[in-house]
Amino acid sequence: MKFLDQAKIYIRSGNGGAGAVSFRREKFLEFGGPDGGDGGRGGDVWVEAVNGLNTLIDYRYQQHFRAKTGMHGMGRNMTGGKGDDVILKVPVGTQIFEEDDETLICDITEIGQRYRLAKGGNGGFGNLHFTTSTNRAPRRANPGQEGIERTIWLRLKLIADAGLVGLPNAGKSTFLASVTAAKPKIADYPFTTLHPNLGVARVDGREFVIADIPGLIEGASEGVGLGDRFLGHVERTRVLLHLVSAQEEDVAKAYQVIRGELEAYEHGLADKPEIVALSQIDTLDPEARKAKVKALKKACGRDPLLLSAVSHEGLNDALRQLASVIDQSRAAEAGTAEAEE
């Protein structure tokens, strides 16, 4: 399935149905009074999060959505039926913005969550509403109210517990494939990963979701390489696993480049808990490994994890550390929620 994480669409709620001009027509009743019913309300436009979606690709092929007009009123004081709604089905994690692409309308974070983006127009009054003491047979009815039209942006920010960051070819996709059932594209050239991938990891009876995003390079915040647009997909994570390839000539610089891009992106990414790991260590001899571990430790201020997807060295340790941070974050979040109640 192709991946699309943003789409610009046009929506319009339905017009209200027109009120009816009608009079009672009954045997032995020469001058029946007005009995024109009201028009029905126009259909609404809703957005709803559904299970099983992780892309906005459907909105590449259809960008215009219009709800139905309400039914017109009828005689015998019958109100017209409501127009059919339009429901925009989106993945969990979708944000809806105004046309300026800055004003947030809503953030859809749970399956089944709905939000009304445009309310249908009210139906017009039938002639029964216009009866007065001096006008017992009005021939007037209102048209329905027009629907609301607006242009909006849909932006998807995947919801994951942990995010993988690093330079291209740092081994992020290989790590994801080794610890989850995800099958990202893996090859020995930069930018093999062109869109985010998700996988569910399990360790010690616990499970959590990991997001792998395309690699960053120096200047990504200014649009170099694939830019930093995919960093939005790790904004919601609780912890970052920062992979630095053992094949880098200067592991300290590789670490600092990514930290610089996280800080330039802002949105709190640089403040997230971070676990640092030296990946692809199976490519080093013991002496080179020791030197690179020392250099990376000096750069990040802590002992890095040592990982190899080939020999599986350190994979479970990494998962346990991620799970521990995620558990602490969830517990703190639950405590905050209880305190607010």
Swiss-Prot record:
It is found in: Cytoplasm. InterPro entries: G_OBG, GTP-bd, GTP-bd_Obg/CgtA, GTP1-OBG_CS, GTP1_OBG_dom, GTP1_OBG_dom_sf, OBG_GTPase, P-loop_NTPase. Mg(2+) binds at S173, T193. GO terms for molecular function: GTP binding; GTPase activity; magnesium ion binding. It comes from Brucella anthropi (strain ATCC 49188 / DSM 6882 / CCUG 24695 / JCM 21032 / LMG 3331 / NBRC 15819 / NCTC 12168 / Alc 37) (Ochrobactrum anthropi). GO terms for cellular component: cytoplasm. The keyword RNA-binding does not apply. Belongs to the TRAFAC class OBG-HflX-like GTPase superfamily. OBG GTPase family. Pfam families: GTP1_OBG, MMR_HSR1. Keywords: Cytoplasm, GTP-binding, Hydrolase, Magnesium, Metal-binding, Nucleotide-binding. GO terms for biological process: ribosome biogenesis. Residues 1-159 form the Obg domain. GTP binds at residues 166-173, 191-195, 212-215, 279-282, 308-310. Its cofactor is Mg(2+). Monomer. CDD domains: Obg (cd01898). This is GTPase Obg. Residues 160-327 form the OBG-type G domain. Its EC number is 3.6.5.-. It is an enzyme of class 3 (hydrolase). HAMAP family: GTPase_Obg. Its main location: cytoplasm. The keyword Metal-binding applies. An essential GTPase which binds GTP, GDP and possibly (p)ppGpp with moderate affinity, with high nucleotide exchange rates and a fairly low GTP hydrolysis rate. Plays a role in control of the cell cycle, stress response, ribosome biogenesis and in those bacteria that undergo differentiation, in morphogenesis control.
